[in-house]
Amino acid sequence: MTNIITRFAPSPTGFLHIGSARTALFNYLFARHNNGKFFLRIEDTDKKRSTKEAVEAIFSGLKWLGLNWDGEVIFQSKRNSLYKEAALKLLKEGKAYYCFTRQEEIAKQRQQALKDKQHFIFNSEWRDKGPSTYPADIKPVIRLKVPREGSITIHDTLQGEIVIENSHIDDMILIRTDGTATYMLAVIVDDHDMGITHIIRGDDHLTNAARQIAIYHAFGYEVPNMTHIPLIHGADGTKLSKRHGALGVEAYKDMGYLPESLCNYLLRLGWSHGDDEIISMNQAIEWFNLASLGKSPSKLDFAKMNSINSHYLRMLDNDSLTSKTVEILKQNYKISEKEVSYIKQAMPSLIVRSETLRDLAQLAYIYLVDSPMIYSQDAKEVINNCDKDLIKQVIENLSKLEQFNKECVQNKFKEIAIYNGLKLNDIMKPVRALITGMTASPSVFEIAETLGKENILKRLKIIYYNNLNF
């Protein structure tokens, strides 16, 4: 079998989109499964829209996901001389031509076709003219001379055979008036020079496939195997947008998802291995094949994403979870070694209530005794409506405890409840709000044991401060 070579070729015009990350993943897995190569190419021919920041976002996103590429990164912006050389070769062979038609004239023809309700294909008057007719005052483009007769067949692994008549393919521009290559030319020259054997990309590129094959044929290049995968849709079945969660990979990292989890989730968006839901990267490399790709669009499902992420979180040991949680908290707060030890001790009770690292960090804030308390709106309402005399009893009773472990604290609260003819929850509700700033949290008794008497009493006494404006 020919050595498999795939590529991921994003345009650096923004963040690494979640759909693009899936495309990169599929190319990476197919190459690794076949002991092939996975290359990265930056398609930055659009100078106005391409940015260095976007390039860095692509690099960091791929590295974070663990999709490490082979060899040096290819930048199209550094290869324009090669594209011009290739276009001139086609000119010399009569497979391309100089076109001097102004854009205004083409726009006029397009408007007329629209008015006549006809499909517009630009037919250049310069297609068969020679140098003696060339105007001196107009800079030309170089166009591909697509054969008038015949058809082009797209052989797609997933979509099957698609036949496009040549009469429906325009003489596309290869070199612009400023001498720069178009995307259509650059991608063919690059794929050939890089030895790409398989192209795996979104089916939004299917409309370009026939035009690109026409360029392959003009050069006499072998056409790579093509697989056009359905795009990811939102939960409502419509095209994925920001309102659905069409964010960059960096955003998912910031939201507290693990890279292994996100790769697992993206893999299952359009590819399956029986009923397996949890698939490690090593298993994915071993099992991945194009035959198991789905033909229907997948829907972005955050509930499923969270479920998979929680599984991967629970696979981490206590030290790793603590380290990752503290790393997030340190973005906004100073964390002492004492507080790190509190979080580590509490981690077993935090992880069972968390689906993401952000969830963990939010709960772990309870243990930052040197930072100001943060109260949810619900917690503030509970505190405003609570019986302050009851809280005073709690403070007095807890102050007398010699042992401050969870059993002793729990027993003391039960005694207070019985003494006041209350249910335990009637007391714990305002106590939880004061100690954690939340109305739902890990066990207050476990929190009390971890933080100790002094910190717990300090938080309970805050109810007497007049400047809180609860």
Curated annotation (Swiss-Prot):
Its EC number is 6.1.1.17. Its main location: cytoplasm. It comes from the Bacteria. One of its GO terms (biological process) is glutamyl-tRNA aminoacylation. It catalyses: tRNA(Glu) + L-glutamate + ATP = L-glutamyl-tRNA(Glu) + AMP + diphosphate. InterPro entries: aa-tRNA-synth_I_cd-bd (IPR045462), aa-tRNA-synth_I_codon-bd_sub2 (IPR020751), aa_tRNA-synth_I_cd-bd_sf (IPR008925), Glu-tRNA-ligase_bac/mito (IPR004527), Glu/Gln-tRNA-synth (IPR000924), Glu/Gln-tRNA-synth_Ib_cat-dom (IPR020058), GluQ/Sye (IPR049940), GluRS_core (IPR033910). A motif ('KMSKS' region) lies at residues 239-243. A motif ('HIGH' region) lies at residues 10-20. ATP binds at K242. Keywords: Aminoacyl-tRNA synthetase, ATP-binding, Cytoplasm, Ligase, Nucleotide-binding, Protein biosynthesis. Pfam families: Anticodon_2, tRNA-synt_1c. Disulfide bonds: none annotated. One of its GO terms (cellular component) is cytosol. GO terms for molecular function: ATP binding; glutamate-tRNA ligase activity; tRNA binding; zinc ion binding. It is found in: Cytoplasm. PANTHER family: GLUTAMATE--TRNA LIGASE (PTHR43311), GLUTAMATE--TRNA LIGASE, MITOCHONDRIAL-RELATED (PTHR43311:SF2). Catalyzes the attachment of glutamate to tRNA(Glu) in a two-step reaction: glutamate is first activated by ATP to form Glu-AMP and then transferred to the acceptor end of tRNA(Glu). Belongs to the class-I aminoacyl-tRNA synthetase family. Glutamate--tRNA ligase type 1 subfamily. Monomer. This is Glutamate--tRNA ligase 2. It comes from Rickettsia prowazekii (strain Madrid E).
